């Protein structure tokens, strides 16, 4: 096939034909005289395409003289250069563009091109381009090529060469060339064809196919033609009572007008025999006169354009027709957004009805016909073609009744009608029926077939995407044939509509929360035990709690709604995947995610935190309870962030002093409150401030609490502990635990030991006895994967009181810092007492790895403190004061009372905000000393209390040797607790579940084993919730040597500094709660003093109760 893009070299053409100048080179117009030699025209040159004005026409001045097939013509036919629209640049002329740009430009182009005298005015003659003609339209070209298209007249050739010599580059077949005379004859025939369709109009001439009937002229003529009476030539008068015969039509017309019409001036009624008006009078005489033309066939109004033989019975029709020559389209579509213009109002109405409305008011009322059309012209056409020329359509045919079901064949009807109709009908539109069906364009299909598929008429809406083509209003529909679904027009309009539609759809389909963050929402789904942030979260609705980006990532609930990662998809990238987060936030998120995932002690490894004891931890505190609370508050979580804990992000910090996480255990959770899964690594040690891991843990716990019945600390009777951050439900939450705590009031020091249910929230602050399934036992060295649940050794101050698993006790064994679970019984408290995470949250040592985490909802269980940081691994695991049996009702009550008291004191201390000052000392002694022995020597109490509390300090220093290494977290927690106590002083101490037994009497000056009360544990900062080591089962009181395990508050105060993370992390401010003031140690000292003063009594009470 000829490559239109490659212009044939001039020389190549010279052989068969005379050399032709390039399109830029003007060629003298070819006249008959200009041609010499045998006049042969290559038909392909004459018509590259039957419907295009293309070079074929340009090159074809066959009527003027024969031209050999010229490659130029072929090239011009195929290639369109980006030349100006100048009428002279035929090769590059884009008819549609020209028409759209200026209807007149096309006319000018045609006029300039049409130099042949062969008969067309301003355009090729009717027959020249008409596809309806039996011969190719290109042969009808009569114009000599204009200079721009000029084809040099073929020079004299040898006849041998002059014959059709297919040019090697010529594209298309080389039919036998027609002599000029033959062409002239054909052209004459074409002109003689009674094509009332405006084939004579440039729009209709052969352009129809390229334009797909988009030119207005065609439709106008079609309409006119329909309106025009049949080409009748009547010479006999059929007026009632008159039978005169005349020699000519003119005589008959004169007779009628003078004798019948003017003779009956009072009544304007047609008495012509068989008139469809049935004697219905007209309103005016001129109307009757015009009507009579229908009977006589008179068409006095003739087109004045050269070569146009059109004539009309009505002047208005002639005017409309003339617009086809001039390109004028004064009638604009009134539909909003539709830019189509028409040369006559009827065409516009037709377009509007077809494309912008499904209504088909024009019904064929002939018997047995149910066809309906959108416009009268289509109806007339239908009647004329289907029912015959004698069946006249009148206004009576317009149906007002309900639209009958449009027969599906209606779409096919146009074609059939065209086929059955006169040649002019066919000549009008040669567009395939298929192309026309979808489009209601009257021009494309027979106008009568407005029944084009309903989609055609309705679908062609500007707003809708019309695959069919020029939807109504499409700019492509250049011609009045608005319906004419020009293929090109269709493509353009369709493309436009598609583009618009795509845009709309894109806006509508825009995915929510496509931040690209892969972190799964950390939110916990109610009581679901799973804390993991990963896929389990996907099941959860994305909310601040469920959203991985939400509170867990310190992102507001709003952001959680747009969680970048699917709720169920684990945030593989962790917080780091959140591009918008600050490093601290990323770290926090990672820690939380890690703890939630149980991935490890590191923030990222804490992912296992989400499932403690192999079971997903339900949030310990309901989000509802702590709407403003965000376990990650200490972390960079915004106050607007959901209060829910970041799903089991590893509470890398030691339990917070006031964190009831160790104590708070959903009473209803049988090991489900929070999974103290030894495998859930708590990012206890995580470099991020304990607040992050702690908060994460607390968030996770809070989430777990939430689903659990009675999970809320309040529900569990831990209301007094409500102030304690639930995130540290394990008691190691970390300074941020306060943030995690429902009560933002907690300062960093008020971190719950575990991410377990907020000590203040959910069921018991202390782990509920046997409420949680036994988490996988973990060695103290190994922190449960649910590190988020249990502060790592670092979080616990590096020491985790090793308490027998809560499973052993049937209840969570609460380490002192962890505080006793407020749950069912002292056993629940025992974990709190026993669970004394070491101060260093960095070590995600499963605090309760040894405990059946699930057995009680131990907030202090290893879930929060999955693995104490190695640095803070308890130098010596302190036996947690596990309440082996729920029978310690009295002792537990006492312990609980003491814990409550201690918690209150710790709250005071926390409120003092000196927790951060507490050195990260003695994370080793996680035993109740921290909690029970929360009595810190005033000097120590005065020592800066680490706001993060033991095990919560972002940097849990190794436990100070001065204090029990393991309890140091306790001390720290205590100090933190003191800060929190002070902080919580404002908030009444949570009522921890009665500690089964408080560790020995608290010694003010010495390191008294902190009460199993989670508050104490939190205050102590030690892993109050840490369960005793797997094998260790001890009564919290028994296992706790209260005398020996005296809290060295000075050491605690000193130690929390290293252990406690910055108060900012722990503060609830981010969670919307007032973070416990993380003031200097001296602040905590005041609280500590109060605590110390109260501790002796508490200790004695505990001892007596023990």
Curated annotation (Swiss-Prot):
Record's disease association: Polydactyly, postaxial, A8: A form of postaxial polydactyly, a condition characterized by the occurrence of supernumerary digits in the upper and/or lower extremities. In postaxial polydactyly type A, the extra digit is well-formed and articulates with the fifth or a sixth metacarpal/metatarsal. PAPA8 is an autosomal recessive condition characterized by the presence of postaxial extra digits (hexadactyly) on the hands and/or the feet. Polydactyly, preaxial 1: A form of polydactyly, a condition defined by the occurrence of supernumerary digits in the upper and/or lower extremities. Preaxial or radial polydactyly refers to the presence of extra digits on the radial side of the hand. PPD1 is an autosomal recessive form characterized by duplication of the distal phalanx of the thumb.
Region (Interaction with DNA): 283-291, 345-350, 375-381
Protein species of origin: Homo sapiens (Human)
Cross-link position per record: Glycyl lysine isopeptide (Lys-Gly) (interchain with G-Cter in SUMO2): 1003
Signal sequence segment: none
N6-acetyllysine: residues bearing it: 518
Gene coding for it: GLI1
Positions annotated as zinc finger (C2H2-type): 235-260, 268-295, 301-325, 331-356, 362-387
Primary location recorded for the protein, binned into one broad class: cytoplasm
Compositional bias ranges of the Polar residues kind: 442-463, 768-779
Tissue expression from the record: Detected in testis (at protein level). Testis, myometrium and fallopian tube. Also expressed in the brain with highest expression in the cerebellum, optic nerve and olfactory tract. Isoform 1 is detected in brain, spleen, pancreas, liver, kidney and placenta; isoform 2 is not detectable in these tissues.
Composition bias, Basic and acidic residues: 413-428
Region (Disordered): 375-485, 516-580, 732-792, 817-889, 914-942, 1054-1087
Protein localization: Cytoplasm; Nucleus
Family: Belongs to the GLI C2H2-type zinc-finger protein family.
Keywords: Acetylation, Activator, Cytoplasm, Developmental protein, Differentiation, Disease variant, DNA-binding, Isopeptide bond, Metal-binding, Nucleus, Phosphoprotein, Proto-oncogene, Repeat, Transcription, Transcription regulation, Ubl conjugation, Zinc, Zinc-finger
UniProt biased composition (Low complexity): 544-560, 737-753
GO cellular component terms listed in the entry, alphabetical order: axoneme; ciliary basal body; ciliary base; ciliary tip; cytoplasm; cytosol; GLI-SUFU complex; nucleoplasm
Protein name, entry field: Zinc finger protein GLI1
